Amino acid sequence: MLSATPLYGNVHSWMNSERVRMCGASEDRKILVNDGDASKARLELREENPLNHNVVDASTAHRIDGLAALSMDRTGLIREGLRVPGNIVYSSLCGLGSEKGREAATSTLGGLGFSSERNPEMQFKPNTPETVEASAVSGKPPNGFSAIYKTPPGIQKSAVATAEALGLDRPASDKQSPLNINGASYLRLPWVNPYMEGATPAIYPFLDSPNKYSLNMYKALLPQQSYSLAQPLYSPVCTNGERFLYLPPPHYVGPHIPSSLASPMRLSTPSASPAIPPLVHCADKSLPWKMGVSPGNPVDSHAYPHIQNSKQPRVPSAKAVTSGLPGDTALLLPPSPRPSPRVHLPTQPAADTYSEFHKHYARISTSPSVALSKPYMTVSSEFPAARLSNGKYPKAPEGGEGAQPVPGHARKTAVQDRKDGSSPPLLEKQTVTKDVTDKPLDLSSKVVDVDASKADHMKKMAPTVLVHSRAGSGLVLSGSEIPKETLSPPGNGCAIYRSEIISTAPSSWVVPGPSPNEENNGKSMSLKNKALDWAIPQQRSSSCPRMGGTDAVITNVSGSVSSAGRPASASPAPNANADGTKTSRSSVETTPSVIQHVGQPPATPAKHSSSTSSKGAKASNPEPSFKANENGLPPSSIFLSPNEAFRSPPIPYPRSYLPYPAPEGIAVSPLSLHGKGPVYPHPVLLPNGSLFPGHLAPKPGLPYGLPTGRPEFVTYQDALGLGMVHPMLIPHTPIEITKEEKPERRSRSHERARYEDPTLRNRFSEILETSSTKLHPDVPTDKNLKPNPNWNQGKTVVKSDKLVYVDLLREEPDAKTDTNVSKPSFAAESVGQSAEPPKPSVEPALQQHRDFIALREELGRISDFHETYTFKQPVFTVSKDSVLAGTNKENLGLPVSTPFLEPPLGSDGPAVTFGKTQEDPKPFCVGSAPPSVDVTPTYTKDGADEAESNDGKVLKPKPSKLAKRIANSAGYVGDRFKCVTTELYADSSQLSREQRALQMEGLQEDSILCLPAAYCERAMMRFSELEMKEREGGHPATKDSEMCKFSPADWERLKGNQDKKPKSVTLEEAIAEQNESERCEYSVGNKHRDPFEAPEDKDLPVEKYFVERQPVSEPPADQVASDMPHSPTLRVDRKRKVSGDSSHTETTAEEVPEDPLLKAKRRRVSKDDWPEREMTNSSSNHLEDPHYSELTNLKVCIELTGLHPKKQRHLLHLRERWEQQVSAADGKPGRQSRKEVTQATQPEAIPQGTNITEEKPGRKRAEAKGNRSWSEESLKPSDNEQGLPVFSGSPPMKSLSSTSAGGKKQAQPSCAPASRPPAKQQKIKENQKTDVLCADEEEDCQAASLLQKYTDNSEKPSGKRLCKTKHLIPQESRRGLPLTGEYYVENADGKVTVRRFRKRPEPSSDYDLSPAKQEPKPFDRLQQLLPASQSTQLPCSSSPQETTQSRPMPPEARRLIVNKNAGETLLQRAARLGYEEVVLYCLENKICDVNHRDNAGYCALHEACARGWLNIVRHLLEYGADVNCSAQDGTRPLHDAVENDHLEIVRLLLSYGADPTLATYSGRTIMKMTHSELMEKFLTDYLNDLQGRNDDDASGTWDFYGSSVCEPDDESGYDVLANPPGPEDQDDDDDAYSDVFEFEFSETPLLPCYNIQVSVAQGPRNWLLLSDVLKKLKMSSRIFRCNFPNVEIVTIAEAEFYRQVSASLLFSCSKDLEAFNPESKELLDLVEFTNEIQTLLGSSVEWLHPSDLASDNYW
């Protein structure tokens, strides 16, 4: 109580006594919603409200509402700029955020065709739990999805509902029209054709949530309805929060395939349609993806009769469904010459391309010249070669069409998966059913769909998106389709949403990969490449290696390998597929590596990662890869002979029971979902449970090894809602993770080896060159495919890569192929490496673009999504922003073809502008090529050794890859998807397993299991699986060149081999390194570019890179965190990524600044990590901090997820070692620099989206000061300005104010709060003092253990110092800080000091401020750390941000001493002391709650009113201050104002509704408080006015000051006639009479006139009694009526007449009323008093004008 007295010392005694008396009574202080709560709310909103499109009826549900939901959530974003060529929309961009969407998607899937459409004879009832879960989650029954029932093939065909029947959103359908599908309702995927017929790939919904169209597309792709396939194999277990497609065991799968239901399953694309429609763009009539059911997807025939045909008859529907995939449709459709004009793929591609596709996918890296469509075709033929050739799509066009449907399907699957955690598998299942036409598709729709869809898609976009093809043939999306799909192969709707990581789960919806290929074939290579460019980045972003993006970026290749290499990791294939699509399409020759990866798992590793990446996406090869790996079954050809029943090998449903349609037994390679992680094709598609044929078997191990697939799932789940994916992830993770992880790790090693391999590098260079040229043409497509950049984020684009690392553990397989060599660090070993090496050159710019687009997306999504979510909204947004940035800039194409363009960037070294994309293909490919590649390629290699050797950067890349993969598996997977819920989900469920395994192995020694043991165990298991998979080397063999590069070495390094800092760091650290490596890559790329910054593009790329990465990392993580405890894990992983990369980057002077910023971004992204990292930073070396941060992030994520790896101690140790290594390598003041960088980066974690500032953390502190508003600036101008694209991505991330803020907050509460206990706060304070990133990291590590605790007291600062300075940090900033674990304090000069504080700042409104505040600091620091050139660039980038930056902190703010003990805030202090600027600063930046009350219950308004600060009172009221806020003693602000005699304030308060009648609890009223006569009189009059006066009150009488009668003439008087009362403004017609007086003259008495209302329709008028008129006229009534028929006569009751007349003020003759009886019921006749009657009565009327009166002086 006493402590509060000083606060009120200056107030009157009454205030002192009462306040002091009440001071300690009870803390009435209002605590803002925790960030975690907010994020949760947002996430929940996202999950629950998937944007309408998720909500569909049972049959409609089959259109993959989940995908729609994903799409919807990001619809705005998609429309904003993610629409790529041909109106392709990245479904990932679509809101994958709501659980409802997921639910809907799941339901849709269930209703769609998980019935025995394929196998009418087979009655399959999805597991009841799954069905129930779907219903429960979705809130709606699985809709015919509950059970597969025998249905005659014919019925099933007819059963396939049209888009409308399926409940396709008409909007989705409409969207298709933009695709120009020529009315084709379905997409026919040539490769899907045979498969569809045999395996019914058409019913294979790759991504339930991501792409409703993808399933439909696949179905549509099937020319004929696939054999009736029991579709209910996979029903969404959790329709809402977590959509899990139930993938029945292989025994179910078989029936699935046999069904001849090729009827295209149409998925209506509610909102997802924009994303999913890209796949849909296939004009094929049978476009099952439209329905959300791929051709191979079993669909209820009754539900999708239109799809049933798999023919064009349903084209309109499909088209409608495809609407969301406008551009994509074109891409997909071209391959199939079906009626749908979109099927541009030559007929030859169907068979020719199919074989070629297979071939290319098998050896895409080897045959760079292979056209995407061809490679996809090859894949198709590889899988469904027989199917395609002898399937329903024997002709290339059909194959093309089939391929197109697959992309749609894939998209849909990806989207739906993303939406549904588990729905994608469902959709895939459904799609499979549809595709069964040509090949019996196993009920595991994924596998089947992959077969048929993939074949077609391969034909269409041979190397394009085969990444998903493995898990789902549909993976092979054409480039444009991928962009539309966002991640065509991985989950057609996932390209944009890394969150679609969900598909990394066992579900085998990787099939979507072929989709891009499909369109590309038919359409044009350039278009496809365009799509691929965008798709590839996203593909890359997907865990899958960039299948399609191999050419453009090694990342793609690597990703491809990853997807092929590991079943689940093959999921990255989808991403790679998207990449690959673009790459293959634009430079088939370059892309072949990607395809090759899938096609030839073992060879691919040696081949460029791109091939592997493409391969992952490639339907045929990736399938075994990820299938086998995920299933643990040997990968077998996904495409079976047409006559061969497609039965996925026994799939351990336990694994995929929740997450994916594909059974766990089926190795579901991570498909490249939108932009995040790979999508896992449904195991159903392959007899062996693999999506790709046996020849791909070698590959699956590697791709599957990539944990990126898992993280992808996690990301998707993030988008969908953490809850949704968790179940899926958890069950899925055990097997899938193990398979995925191990192969991934192995892939990583391979990737690394490959990258390190000069030959590989050369090949990469070649591919990149080819890709570069092709991709450059693809740039336009990329621009169109803005969604794809999201998809590209992690994979194709540098930023994307980083993001991919974060988002795309699954995507890593894609990266692993070629470009993903650098990517493995992000996605997985292989993926990270493949993606990262190319990243340095191309990716810095590209990723910056993508980051910018992602950021912009994030911003848009934050606005739209957030809050969801928003997840929407978040990951998507980030990716989108990145893409948008790329689009805006010349480099748009670059991001789009990041896999390809990135090499160009890297080629020239650092400062390659986007325009230079072509120039740097080689460096990109090589990964350690030029200086730019030095930094970036280092990442590309991602091998610690290579990284170190190159730039110290390469050191990071490897750990970065693993870290990325781990991060992906742990939640890093979806940068964008992270925003969604997939990443978090993956983190906690699927990812948590990987992380659990990895961390248990690598971090077990020091692991701190702070969170629930279950989560810890899961995370560690996940880690272990990732680890083992990467080290496995089995299927990852192909990826191994890239993947194994990082895998064995990096994996162990990540695991705990701390020999090599990047790799020596524990798995966690490695992950962090990988994450950071991505960032570092950005950083390095930026730095290298900085010298070349002459073009702002380069700076922009850097910024974009950061932004995209950060947004991906942060928004997804935040959303994830808010959605689930796992969310923090994701965030942490991301951070760690940054951290690890940062360390590597530190090796290079330029690298360090960017890296730290990236790290900061990451940290901010996961505030959870921040505390932990902060703690670590203190004790750890600064250089080590990045790795440590990454590991810490991972740990924090794990902790949040329930797995708490060794925290501080381990991280510190790693950091120290890393510092030693890095400081030696960097030659910079490594440690201090790192600290500064880390500190700067941490504050910038959120603001990092801003320019290179984050990249240049050197001036974090100084910059924070001046650039507190960076976040806002970057949020606002970043999107628009190329210089700020990165920031734009970052601000959303950093401030999360618009998109990321909400998501971040949501995720943050669960992470950061728990990790910010007093100890952590103290550490934060230390960090604040030292500005040491290491300290921050250390704190983060500690925070990880305190995350939960911190979550609870997010608003309470733990340390005194923190409390002391807390008031200096905007609430939002604080909120963001907890996310990053930093406490940002703005100096008087506007500088934001980064202070680590465990306490989470006020959660809700402070978030926006936080980013703003935080940003400036990182910028400053970056300037300090970065070279002069970079520094110059920084300002360039930051100036736009500054434009948007919020009010800078006034100098007084730092001088004000806030009495925290009394519960006082800076706002209250400033209000008391009259610091208006500080008050405005606090209000505008939401630093304090305007209604925050201190311990005595007094708020800022009390203080200002008591002291008479009128302006401050006005500001407070304008910002929503409670005018009647009551202190604990009942004192209101009005009481304070009256007591202190502030009359104007009293007036103001009363005008705002202050209640003057309220008294204090002691009974004092305002009238008793007055001290002046003036105040008393005013209050008396006011109260009298309120209650009125008594009649006898003399004082109440009115005083009239004059009368024309009483006043002398000479005095001013009022002349009534001079200005008679009356309406002054009348119509022109009445103007003449306005001032006229009318006089009636008569020789006889005038008849009485009555003003009466006779009709309700008319007002009162003047009436005469008819009796009076007749008496005067002396005539009868009849004669009067006859003579004057025009005179109106009315009848009224006498009683009514009397009532009205007696009450009339105009009637004064009481005598006249004596004749009337007030109770009489007789009627009276009235005649209206008119001029005619007047004349009749002999009266004359004259008008007197006032002017005449004046002149004539009548008066």
Swiss-Prot record:
The lineage of its organism: Eukaryota, Metazoa, Chordata, Craniata, Vertebrata. Residues 309-345, 388-438, 557-641, 737-760, 773-794, 815-844, 1071-1187, 1220-1328, 1430-1451 are annotated as: Disordered. Residues 775-785, 1076-1107, 1166-1175, 1253-1279 have a biased composition (Basic and acidic residues). Interacts with BCL6; the interaction is direct. Forms ternary complexes with BCL6 and SMRT/NCOR2 on selected target genes promoters; potently repress expression. Can interact with HDAC1, HDAC3 and HDAC5. Interacts with PCGF1; the interaction is direct. Interacts with KDM2B. Component of an approximately 800 kDa repressive BCOR complex at least composed of BCOR, RYBP, PCGF1, RING1, RNF2/RING2, KDM2B and SKP1. Interacts with CPNE4 (via VWFA domain). Isoform 1 may interact with MLLT3/AF9. Residues 580-594, 1238-1252, 1430-1447 have a biased composition (Polar residues). ANK repeats lie at residues 1462-1495, 1496-1525, 1529-1558. Keywords: Acetylation, ANK repeat, Chromatin regulator, Disease variant, Isopeptide bond, Microphthalmia, Nucleus, Phosphoprotein, Repeat, Repressor, Transcription, Transcription regulation, Ubl conjugation. Ubiquitously expressed. The modification Phosphoserine is found at S336, S340, S365, S367, S423, S1127, S1139, S1290, S1345, S1410. It is found in: Nucleus. This is BCL-6 corepressor. Belongs to the BCOR family. InterPro entries: Ankyrin_rpt, Ankyrin_rpt-contain_sf, BCOR, BCOR-like, PUFD, PUFD_som_sf. GO terms for molecular function: DNA-binding transcription factor binding; heat shock protein binding; histone deacetylase binding; RNA polymerase II transcription regulatory region sequence-specific DNA binding; transcription cis-regulatory region binding; transcription corepressor activity. There is a cross-link at K786, K872, K1256, K1413 (Glycyl lysine isopeptide (Lys-Gly) (interchain with G-Cter in SUMO2)). Residues 557-578, 605-620 have a biased composition (Low complexity). Transmembrane segments: none annotated. Its main location: nucleus. PROSITE patterns: ANK_REP_REGION (PS50297), ANK_REPEAT (PS50088). The modification N6-acetyllysine is found at K392. Residues 1634-1748 are annotated as: Necessary and sufficient for interaction with PCGF1. It comes from Homo sapiens. One of its GO terms (biological process) is odontogenesis. It is linked to Microphthalmia, syndromic, 2: A very rare multiple congenital anomaly syndrome characterized by eye anomalies (congenital cataract, microphthalmia, or secondary glaucoma), facial abnormalities (long narrow face, high nasal bridge, pointed nose with cartilages separated at the tip, cleft palate, or submucous cleft palate), cardiac anomalies (atrial septal defect, ventricular septal defect, or floppy mitral valve) and dental abnormalities (canine radiculomegaly, delayed dentition, oligodontia, persistent primary teeth, or variable root length). Transcriptional corepressor. May specifically inhibit gene expression when recruited to promoter regions by sequence-specific DNA-binding proteins such as BCL6 and MLLT3. This repression may be mediated at least in part by histone deacetylase activities which can associate with this corepressor. Involved in the repression of TFAP2A; impairs binding of BCL6 and KDM2B to TFAP2A promoter regions. One of its GO terms (cellular component) is BCOR complex.
